[in-house]
Amino acid sequence: MSRYTGPSWKVSRRLGISLSGTGKELARRPYKPGQHGPNSRGKVSEYGMQLTEKQKLRHMYGMNERQFRTLFIKASKIKEGKHGVNFMVLLEQRLDNVVYRLGLATTRRQARQLVNHGHITVDGKRVDIPSYHVEVGQVIGVREKSQNISTIKEAVEATVGRPAFVSFDTEKLEGSFTRLPERDELYPEIDEALVVEYYNQKL
């Protein structure tokens, strides 16, 4: 399954989440496309809830199904901690996500484009793979010749706050994971146990 590249507001309304982070997609019509009102939803099965939760998380991180499933399997091999929490931490360690968390991009989609186009460095070396696994302490920066790109400068200026698990130098345009995130620092609206249940039936 390929990555969805259409309007994010359609996915936001279908899944009941704001992929833009602004909530504007849901403000006017907080119900699925095609419905005639907020009360027209039918009863959702247990499988339907599991599927919806999986789709929410996958779209939030902007991944295709193959990438998402592969990372889920990788998380299952971590011996310590809960599978669902380990999975969410691995999602946070993707390079495109770290670029977003540092405030170098306003959305994960924009962050992925910056990585794909070769504007991002890891420990001083250019890396153009969005799924690159970032370790604690690795320095994520912007290539010197890319530092005047307007979208990057605007994103940094617009960033009000950053998660406690990252540090960022606005002068150098570089930052890093200072530690791995705790579960309570990541999306309280997501029930990762439902995602685990979904894949346990599939794998």
Swiss-Prot record:
NCBIfam families: PRK05327.1, rpsD_bact
Keyword Oxidoreductase: no
Family indicated by similarity: Belongs to the universal ribosomal protein uS4 family.
Organism: Enterococcus faecalis (strain ATCC 700802 / V583)
InterPro entries: Ribosomal_uS4, Ribosomal_uS4_bac-type, Ribosomal_uS4_CS, Ribosomal_uS4_N, S4_RNA-bd, S4_RNA-bd_sf
An example molecular function term from Gene Ontology annotations: structural constituent of ribosome
Annotated keywords: Ribonucleoprotein, Ribosomal protein, RNA-binding, rRNA-binding
Region (Disordered): 22-45
Subunit note: Part of the 30S ribosomal subunit. Contacts protein S5. The interaction surface between S4 and S5 is involved in control of translational fidelity.
Cellular component annotations (GO), alphabetically ordered: small ribosomal subunit
Residue stretches making up the S4 RNA-binding domain: 93-156
GO terms under biological process: ribosomal small subunit biogenesis; translation
Function: One of the primary rRNA binding proteins, it binds directly to 16S rRNA where it nucleates assembly of the body of the 30S subunit. With S5 and S12 plays an important role in translational accuracy.
Domain of life: Bacteria
Protein name: Small ribosomal subunit protein uS4
PANTHER family: 30S 40S RIBOSOMAL PROTEIN, SMALL RIBOSOMAL SUBUNIT PROTEIN US4M
